[in-house]
Amino acid sequence: METLREKINKQRKYFSTGETKDINFRIEKLKKLRDVLKSEEEKIFEALKKDLMKSSFESYVTEVAMVYDEINMHIKNIKKWSKKRRVKTPLVQFPAKSFIKLEPYGVVLIIGPFNYPFMLTMDPLIGSIAAGNTAVIKPSESAPETSKILKEILEKVFDEKYVLHVNPERGKEVVEELLKEKFDYIFFTGSATVGKIVMKAASQYLTPVTLELGGKSPCIIDKDCKLELAARRIVWGKLLNSGQTCVAPDYLYVHKDIEEEFIKKLEEEIKNQFGNNPLESEDYSKMVNEREFNRVLSYIDKEKLVFGGNYNRKTFQIEPTILKNVTWNDPVMEREIFGPIFPILSFENLDEVIRLVNSKDKPLALYYFSEDKNKIEKVINSTSSGGVTINDTLVHVSSSYLPFGGVGNSGMGEYHGKYSFDLFSNKKGVMNRKTFLDLKIRYAPFLNKLTIVKKIMK
């Protein structure tokens, strides 16, 4: 039986043949991947249902459809994106032509998370394959059913010398084993804690990395917003996957003049979307495991509870829960919630909210609800985050035309669409000098040449 190291070495040998660099070959593989995905859709839905209790609708919209978008965009644009990109040549280097040549890195390691185990593993794989790399995939051990169907799909499309699915059952042990190997690029999605471990391991070989992490993404609700619409969109964004979304609105800063009315709208909207008992709704998902269930449950402070708070320990479900009068000293504000809790903080002055947001780690996303164009521009220009959505939640992540990634503690590197293709490509600068002219001023001896050079290069 081959060891992991031997399999990775096989990938390296296969990459050196140059087959993955052929653009038509890449396109055909992506088309085949799309065809297999379509034939296996129901199995994907079943796996996500078992792992996270996601409905087929949620699974399609937030996982499968986004993967199709990425595949289609790459198939359509690979030839254009792969062309050498001509750039200007400085006058002092004439006669010459300059261009940027995009080339694949080689063997890429992709470590996927549990919360969107299909999409957040497949999306980076698509960019990696489109750019001409081989890939080693390590899905999350916390989503075992999705990992199984991923393995089935990948084996129908790729030989393991091209794309290798690593069984995640050994969890931390297999990650440690992988990180001892030398890769040409590492793409990790998960917590900041593990992200630091990945980055430290990558530094041993000076391997470039992309870290898609998370953090506490703020949601600011100003008094001039469309209140009912804001509540509807916030409930949708917060409760997708039971709050286990890296860009979920983590906490809500609500203007004090509308706080009570907003909480009522929030309660109404939870009932509209999931009924009077969300724990019985077929559209309401669960925490991924008992550990996460207990962690999120510990954040519910009964003294600040105004709505929800019930749970089902057998199914690992926690009701949508609203907490009022929350402060930064409360446990729920110590780290990313990653669960269906709405902590409400009130504010009077937008500048103060911006100051408080900026005093924390830079978030993966920021949301602002307002109809005031000047205040919208102020929030965008005065804060730093991986991405921003105005008057909605999450939707910026679904666009293949926008870069998605973190900043600071929420991650590094951006992908989706062309940004994925560029991410997994080394940008090689090339200058092709002509031979019919050779100015000797650059060669020694340099006596009496400085004055002339200063006139040219100023």
Model-derived regions, located:
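Residues at or immediately preceding the N-termini of alpha-helices
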Residues: L4, I23, E41, G171, ...
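N-terminal Rossmann-like NAD(P)+-binding subdomain of aldehyde/semialdehyde dehydrogenases
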Residues: M1-F99
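Short, well-ordered beta-strand elements within core beta-sheets of diverse protein domains
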Residues: K13-E19, I110, C219-I221, Y251-K256, ...
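ALDH superfamily catalytic-core signature
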Residues: F158, T193-T327, I390
